């Protein structure tokens, strides 16, 4: 188990899954879908946020959201962490 050290680059960015985790058959909708999603930041904080699903696979969802500082960001998260709004 890793522990925050205070030296993590971009500690408030969401952790994102890698392609081996989310799979290869990616579906991309014409219009992003409004969702609520749980993210875990690089420093280990957990937040439930409003986001848009911009792509998905059987296992995961690629979300686009505004971080708590008002900056746009994206992350791949597990499908179980996402519900439609």
Outline where the language-model segments fall.
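Basic/aromatic-rich interaction segments and small domains that mediate binding to polyanionic partners
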Residues: 4-12, 16-79
């Amino acid at each position: 188990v890793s522990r925050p050290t205070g030296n993590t680059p971009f500690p408030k960015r969401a952790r994102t899954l890698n392609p081996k985790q989310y799979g290869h058959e990616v579906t991309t909708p014409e219009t992003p879908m409004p969702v609520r999603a749980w993210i875990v930041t690089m420093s280990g904080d957990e937040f439930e946020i409003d986001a848009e699903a911009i792509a998905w696979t059987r296992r995961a969802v690629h979300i686009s959201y505004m971080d708590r500082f008002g900056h746009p960001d994206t992350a791949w998260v597990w499908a179980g962490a996402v519900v439609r709004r």
